[in-house]
Amino acid sequence: MFYLNVYEELKTSRFHNINFLEYKKKLEEEKKILKTGHNQDELLKIWFIQTAIEIIEQYYECFSLLKKRSYQKAWNILEKIEISFINIKFNNIIYSDCPVLVYIEKYTYMLQKLYPYKIFASPEMLHKKVVCSVCGKTMIPFSDCLHIAGKVYDGEMCYGIVKELDFINVAMVTKPNQKYSVCFQDIENPKRYKVLEYIIPKLKSEFIQWTYNIYTDYEPYSNYKIGRNDLCPCGSGKKFKRCCLLNNQGIAYPHYEFTLP
């Protein structure tokens, strides 16, 4: 099977030389053939390999955007990668034998932690009618639809298609379900991303080993003109008098120490 050979390539350094466009076309052709036999195990493996290739492509794109200082666009790609890994795990697929996927998952999380984003918009909506992408039936308890959103059937991931909804409100949150709806002043200005501005130029290629530790440091209160009832400059969302004013050390901020090869 072609897909088995592809996965063996992904598990080695040969993945750098893969023609992704050609491989995706061949995998889709092989999936169509296997669908006639409804071999769920093989179709799940093909879906996984297609998703793995998509993850690698997106990571290359993300790295390119970071180098171009397009940090917000790179952030959105990182979220797509994160969601793909969630989908893979939801289908009980183990990929610990594939170093490139292990690397990308690790560094996706590490890169996200370097962003200054703290507040996100979280819309609240009532889904009045949702239909299944596999069978087209309404997805409600006790319906005829037996499919589970997020699971793979015949090589395709099931998802709910929202046909009717009511918009309720928008909340400001620190732990969002959708990370792309970030609230950040002057979001396209690269100079607002100080940590990324420091480390990204030092990364010479997409796949090198680098690490960092985060410590809490403090700036003198005198660096800020702030009232007791103003929001604390540390970004906690709390009032100054209930936050850094209490520590008697200054305004807290994260200090990063990087280790590069």
Region locations from a protein language model:
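Polar/charged alpha-helical tracts
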Residues: 5-8, 12, 21-32, 76-79, ...
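Polar/acidic, low-complexity leader/linker segments enriched in S/T/G and N/D
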Residues: 1-68, 73
